Amino acid sequence: CIRDSMLTVREHFGKLKGLKLVYMGDARYNMGNSLMVACSKLGMHFVACTTKKYFPNAELVAQCEEYAKASGGSITLTEDVQEGTKDADVIYTDVWVSMGEPDEVWTERIHDLTPYKVTKDVMKNAGEKAIFLHCLPAFHDLKTKIGKEMGERFNLTDKEVTDEVFESEQS
């Protein structure tokens, strides 16, 4: 997923070095960590935009800061959606609950991460040139079995990204 995402970004922008990639959501696990490592080694500016509870492990952040220093990139952790997404080239998210985690974590994640949902306003703040990426599968509507179940259970029509963004030209 990471290699494919980086190839997509390079194809779209013609480069990777110097671009700003913002990961919104739970940045403690595979996608957030892998994107942070990749961006730091490729000279990109990685931003984890989430509540502090979901920031990446401090040791990994320190290692990635060293990689970024050598490559010309940077690592930023922020809870501020406006600040974090401003002038971003790439807005990236993933499902809020990883494979193998119990259903009980949904309530907590939805509560904690709803402010970090990728919306039209987030993309507008990033700018017209910004693109949206998702590792997939995405819960952006109620058309899947799990999407429908979560919608009924939590009275939601989407989770980590709105259907409007997921189906947009920026996606």
Predicted regions and their residues:
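Short, small-residue-biased leader/transition segments that mark boundaries at the very start
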Residues: C1-I2
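Glycine-rich phosphate/diphosphate-binding loop of Rossmann-like nucleotide-binding domains
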Residues: E11-T93, M99
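Hydrophobic/aromatic ligand-binding patch that stacks against planar heteroaromatic rings
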Residues: A38, V122, E164
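Short, structured coil segments at secondary-structure junctions
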Residues: L42, A126-E128, E167-E169
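Rossmann-like adenosine-cofactor binding region
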Residues: E65-V161
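Short helix/strand-capping connector loops at secondary-structure junctions
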Residues: V161-S171
